[in-house]
Swiss-Prot record:
Biased composition (Gly residues): 117-131
Biological-process GO terms, alphabetical: cap-dependent translational initiation; formation of cytoplasmic translation initiation complex; translational initiation
A Pfam family reported for this protein in Swiss-Prot or TrEMBL: eIF-3_zeta
Subunit: Component of the eukaryotic translation initiation factor 3 (eIF-3) complex.
Location(s) in or outside the cell: Cytoplasm
This protein's domain notes: The RNA gate region regulates mRNA cap recognition to prevent promiscuous mRNA-binding before assembly of eif3d into the full eukaryotic translation initiation factor 3 (eIF-3) complex.
Keyword Transport in annotation: no
Protein name: Eukaryotic translation initiation factor 3 subunit D
Length: 532
């Protein structure tokens, strides 16, 4: 077969390519290599550069001496034209027949927290559930450091490293909200934290009841005292049923009526977690704030702010359920108030007759102080008087007044061994787990002009018996100083309450319910159905 040379084109010029390119010589279906403006000019190839691709995610490319960013495209892309047969690769596998060395038994796996150290918490007190790598003692949840028994890092103990994956606890509202209820407004905690309102010192109207001196034997160290059940009658009358409030309501200048139990909860709303509700009744120009009989405000919460609070349970035999613990804490506080006073008739201080008792000798001695606050925005204008009922529990030295409160331990009995040496750690743990409750106690004491708070620490005689308790010790706190220590801002509390008052004042006459959202940091105001 003869070799035929292709015909040469006539050159119009002796130098350079022809002005037209034949069709058979034009480039067709030739891959185009994308380029990058970051490519260095003059570098044809860098054979010493390390090949990187999208699979290399372990190294950071932004180190101290980082200069030339690597581009996954352009001239420096080493695998752009690489053709890999997916089917061939999928049928290929490598078998590793090397034997893995067994770890020697007894080698502990160290659970590290972020930063290489625990983020907080202590071993004192009840503590909280182990979260984030810190071990703390929670009743019924295994041993703790320093406690005899198996090492909590082995066996069935939980590290808590998958606590983030636990389903969130769903609570029910404290009141049954039906479809015929109308939601009026929602206020979130973030909005409440920005509120502030300055209220002048209240004016005392009158005081009712009796007071006995405080028994100072409870202040002694190493003095574990059995808490006796004296069975005193305790009155917790709501606002609208208070005969003194009813008498003061006859004055049209008095516009708002409330008790310290209810007001302290509203002022400490942003610290509350457990659900609660308050009934607001508008009658003309007057507002009455009431609690429901047998509702959440009749009982004291336990470990409300803990990371793993007591579970809600309908089992009456579960003494550590939230409901049973609340009932237990309420009884302990009532018994402590009757145990920690010296009932000497010669030392008794009497005010006006107790408005709630009919000369019952078994009534727990209390003093009820009624005060007036002006919530008007214009101090020189018409007053917006708030009538508040506060309580005082006992007398201190030199005629000072005291409030008596108790924190209770359940599930274990560590306080009696650690209270004298680890008192600070126990108090810090209680502040963490019961912040709302302690904040409310502090606000109540400030509103009632109480000079000192006596906070007792009660522990069960037996962890499985919730009827017998010992008072391990008592600490004293000055309310205003204590409020600063635990970050209780009264101006913020007054701002929250004033906002609720403004909302209720603008509505028509009737009943409204202020409800703490059980699962979100917010409160809602509802217009309930008729007949509520």
């Amino acid at each position: 077969m003869a070799l035929r040379l292709p015909a040469l084109l006539d050159a119009n010029a002796p130098w350079g390519p022809p002005s037209t390119v034949p069709e058979d010589l034009k480039f067709d279906d030739v891959p185009y290599a994308p380029f990058s403006k970051g490519d260095k000019l003059g570098k044809v190839a860098d054979w010493a550069a390390e090949t990187k691709d999208g699979k290399d995610q372990k190294r950071t490319q932004f180190g101290k001496n980082f200069r030339d960013p690597y581009h996954a495209y352009g001239a420096s892309s080493a695998s752009f034209f690489t053709n890999e047969d997916a089917e061939e690769l999928s049928s290929f596998s490598v078998v590793d027949n090397a034997k893995n060395a067994n770890k020697p038994r007894g080698t502990a796996t160290v659970l590290k927290t972020r930063g290489g150290a625990p983020r907080g918490g202590s071993f004192a007190g009840r503590g909280g559930s182990q979260r984030g790598g810190r071990f703390q003692n929670q009743p019924g949840r295994g041993p703790v450091g320093g406690q005899r028994g198996p090492n909590p890092r082995f066996g069935k103990s939980k590290f808590g490293w998958r606590d983030f994956d636990k389903p969130q606890r769903i609570r029910n509202a404290s009141v049954d909200i039906t479809d015929d209820w109308t939601e009026i407004q929602e206020i979130t905690y973030s909005e409440m934290q920005k509120l502030s309102y300055d209220v002048a010192q209240g004016v005392e109207i009158d005081t009712y009841g009796d007071l006995f001196p405080y028994d100072r034997k409870f202040d002694r160290t190493n003095n574990i005292t059995k808490l006796a059940h004296l069975g005193r009658t305790v009155f917790n009358t709501t606002t609208s049923e208070d005969p003194i409030m009813q008498e003061l309501a006859k004055d049209p200048a008095n516009r708002i009526f409330i008790t310290d139990t209810i007001l302290s909860q509203i002022m400490c709303t942003t610290k509350s977690v457990a659900p609660w509700d308050i009934v607001i009744t508008k009658k003309g120009e007057q507002l009455f704030f009431d609690k429901r009989e047998g509702g959440p405000l009749d009982f004291i919460t336990v470990d409300e702010n803990a990371a793993d609070p007591p579970a809600d349970s309908t089992d009456k035999d579960n003494i550590n359920s939230s409901a049973n613990l609340g009932f237990e804490a309420t009884l302990i506080n009532q018994n402590f108030a009757s145990n920690a006073i010296t009932e000497d008739p010669k030392s008794k201080v009497s005010y006006k007759a107790n408005p709630f008792s009919n000369n019952d000798s078994n009534v727990l001695c209390h003093a009820y102080k009624y005060k007036k606050f002006n919530l008007s925005d214009d101090p020189e204008g018409a007053p917006l008087n708030l009538i508040l009922r506060t309580e005082v529990d006992a007398l201190g030295p030199d005629g000072t007044t005291l409030n008596l409160r108790v924190l209770n331990e359940y599930g274990s009995s560590e306080w009696k061994n650690k209270f004298n040496t680890g008192r600070g750690a126990i108090i810090a743990a209680e502040l963490k787990h019961n912040l709302n409750k302690i904040s409310r106690w502090t606000v109540q004491s400030i509103l009632g002009d109480v000079d000192q708070m006596k906070i007792g620490f009660a522990s069960r005689v037996s962890p499985k018996d919730n009827t017998q308790h010992n008072i391990i010790g008592v600490v004293s706190r000055e309310p205003k100083q204590f409020a600063e220590q635990i970050n209780v801002n009264l101006n913020n509390g007054w701002g929250i309450f004033k906002s609720v008052v403004n909302i209720a004042t603008a509505k028509d006459d009737g009943k409204y319910v202020l409800v703490k959202d059980p699962n979100n940091p917010a409160v809602k105001i509802y217009k309930p159905a008729a007949g509520f």
